[in-house]
């Protein structure tokens, strides 16, 4: 389907983004709304950051992005740990909260931060399309297992024309079958 849509950029990006969100939904349930929240928040913060005049306005927006992202990450990863530590230091008891750790939260949090930091440093210009940004943050091959890809490395590739030569196709098929063979052994 992706190759059939090779001349329709928006349809191709929409297709992959929807499937990325679907796969994330299947692994994390309604926590895919968290992925959407981080995506929308950082997209608009980067837009504001690019238009902001003055050092302190830009700095404030990047600090807001850091606070939102790291705050969510800290809540899901460290609330029970810190609650237990504080309770033991105070000589009390702590009942762990029922907090489900969303799959890949560290990866998409730091990937989204990479974008806002790159925009803050003026290494890249902010994307004008929320869909392109959602594609970058939710790209399923790296969403749940990494690696974290820098925005300045990934984003320029989004608009590149899709071209697959016979040699590239053959190499891809070879790598897929090699991987399947290695898994079977």
Listing of model-derived features with the role each one plays in the protein:
Residues 1-185:
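Membrane-embedded transmembrane alpha-helical bundles that form the catalytic cores
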